[in-house]
């Protein structure tokens, strides 16, 4: 079993790096504002038709464009969901959503969280899925990538006050990165058996003679960007454990690769744009070390089995509860870590049925800020915050002003870094406390004791860190939970983006200083260890007390 797990992890990472390297080169061209070959004419026509100016923006203008697009998208999606019964492509005649569920869903998909307090096949029409959710899957992913484009330019430009043009970046990211790659993945999914149709739900007779209604829909097109954009919201309630979304072992492997593809490629792109590929490899090493350790812990915990079932005399020591037998324990464990290390949230197994330790690791990966590969764009700019913090700590230890890539990290940048890092822990801890203090919060818990608290903590952690997965034993479709989680999702997304853009605006105006004998190298194993230690230290200090009340207490009981 150990050999199989090692081979699975090694194969996954090897194929990932092979695919991400060339994509990283393409992203580096876009960051450097170099059009991809053959796209100049198309871009010129599009920019002229849409009235888009390619004039560069300062950080406030860039941020305003990103926020404006997302707020407009939120409003459009909200009203679309409220009135979906008036819109076409609704063969099941599904009604509009309640105001609180529509708000929660709109915020969820605009913020790249894709938390779902509903069952897709019984709640949303084909039009809502396509024109509403799938469109936001593209736009939310493009927004995250655009923000990291701006931050990378801030590190590599000198004595400037502009960070690029947000509209140009968003168009290029959507047209030349997300759309073609998602199209290829969707075609592969269709070939493997993922649904792509507009048929009404089909009534069939099962082998037992019973009648069953099979849901249909344009699944493959949404499934592709759901994974590539680290969105994670399933077309069906069972998400990627549903055979109509994820029918084969090959589609499952491709889905895992798609989740990590752009976050990995952005690390390669960062190294190229910075003029030192070792900087990108340093980030990949730090992320990969944490990732491999977490996968190993989850695999070990799930292979050991559920001690309560073993005490009752169960034959198997492997915890298969809540898992698809066609995927098994090892693949389910790997997928769980992939989807929570990135801010994806898609699932092929029920995380609520994992063992106490097996469920704690995905929860902790979200709580540290989704920085282990992370979401498209958001993972890298989240990790860059920890890089700045690690550089600051190292500067304190050696008595020098901290600097990164030749740029001095001053008080303003550190205040903004601390603010950005503290946003999501504050939301998680205060949100969980509020839920446990109120009758409306506690009434949604289906399990008592430590596991019930773990379900609450997981839900708020998932929302605040824009992941979207859940411990499913929580009845979250209520006005209290829909509003609480919508607030966590919105502030967790834009409460981090705003200080990140402010940091970018501050750094882009500075000159790069040449390295001296006292400069801390930020590309070697020493800094990799320091960065990992910083991530672990912040995560441990912030969440150990809360985790002790949930999964740790459950494990010890």
UniProtKB/Swiss-Prot annotation:
Main subcellular location: membrane
GO molecular function, one term: P-type potassium transmembrane transporter activity
Membrane topology: Multi-pass membrane protein
Keyword Protease: no
Keywords: Cell inner membrane, Cell membrane, Ion transport, Membrane, Potassium, Potassium transport, Transmembrane, Transmembrane helix, Transport
GO cellular component, one term: plasma membrane
Subcellular location: Cell inner membrane
Transmembrane segments: 5-25, 63-83, 132-152, 170-190, 253-273, 283-303, 329-349, 356-376, 379-399, 416-436, 484-504, 526-546
InterPro entries reported in the protein's UniProt record: KdpA
HAMAP family recorded: KdpA
Free-text function comment from the UniProt entry: Part of the high-affinity ATP-driven potassium transport (or Kdp) system, which catalyzes the hydrolysis of ATP coupled with the electrogenic transport of potassium into the cytoplasm. This subunit binds the periplasmic potassium ions and delivers the ions to the membrane domain of KdpB through an intramembrane tunnel.
Record family assignment: Belongs to the KdpA family.
Quaternary organization: The system is composed of three essential subunits: KdpA, KdpB and KdpC.
Protein name per its UniProtKB record: Potassium-transporting ATPase potassium-binding subunit
